[in-house]
Curated annotation (Swiss-Prot):
Protein purpose: Catalyzes the hydrolysis of complex carboxylic polyesters found in the cell wall of plants. Degrades cutin, a macromolecule that forms the structure of the plant cuticle. Allows pathogenic fungi to penetrate through the cuticular barrier into the host plant during the initial stage of fungal infection.
Reactions performed catalytically: cutin + H2O = cutin monomers
Primary localization: secreted
Similarity annotation: Belongs to the cutinase family.
Protein name: Cutinase 1
Length: 7
């Protein structure tokens, strides 16, 4: 779920 924070 790191992708969500990378947005």
């Amino acid at each position: 779920v790191i992708y969500i924070f990378a947005r």
